[in-house]
Amino acid sequence: MEVAAKLKYARISAQKARLVADQVRGLGAEQAVNLLRFSNKKAAALMKKVLNSAIANAEHNEGADIDELKVSTVMVDEGPSARRFHARARGRANQILKRTCHITVKVSDSQVEND
C-alpha cells in the first residue's frame, strides 16, 4: 500500500527543496518527521507539512500503522514562475523570477505487496 500527499505551488525553488527531499527519502516516517522538525531550512517546514498529511492519509484511508510506514518516494518538480520587475537606471528593468515547486511525498508500509 502506497499513499501520497501533494503540495502544489510552494513558494520555494525546486533546487532548494530538493536538498531537504534527499535527506528524508527512504527513512522511516517518524524518523523523517524528527529530522525535519530540527532542520532550519524553509523547505523542511513545507516538507514536514506534506509528510504529516501523507501519514494521516495512510492512517485514515488505509488503516495503516504509523510505526510501519516509511517514506518511499519524494519528488520535487518545478512549478510556474511568477515574474516581477526591478527598476534599474535609465528607464530599464530587470526581471526577477519568483520560483515555485510541487512537492509530492509517498509513504508505504514495510511489507512487500504481492500482485
From Swiss-Prot:
Q: Which residue positions does the secretion signal occupy?
A: none
Q: Which GO terms label this protein's molecular function in UniProt?
A: rRNA binding; structural constituent of ribosome
What are the protein's UniProt keywords? Ribonucleoprotein, Ribosomal protein, RNA-binding, rRNA-binding
Q: Which Gene3D superfamilies match?
A: Ribosomal protein L22/L17 (3.90.470.10)
Query: Which GO biological process annotations does it have?
Result: translation
One cellular component term from this protein's GO annotations in UniProt: cytosolic large ribosomal subunit
| Pfam families according to UniProt | Ribosomal_L22
What this chain does, per the entry, is described as: This protein binds specifically to 23S rRNA; its binding is stimulated by other ribosomal proteins, e.g. L4, L17, and L20. It is important during the early stages of 50S assembly. It makes multiple contacts with different domains of the 23S rRNA in the assembled 50S subunit and ribosome.
Recorded hits in HAMAP family, A to Z, give: Ribosomal_uL22_B
Task: Give the record's family classification.
Answer: Belongs to the universal ribosomal protein uL22 family.
* Record text on subunit structure and interactions: Part of the 50S ribosomal subunit.
This protein's name: Large ribosomal subunit protein uL22
Gene behind this chain? rplV
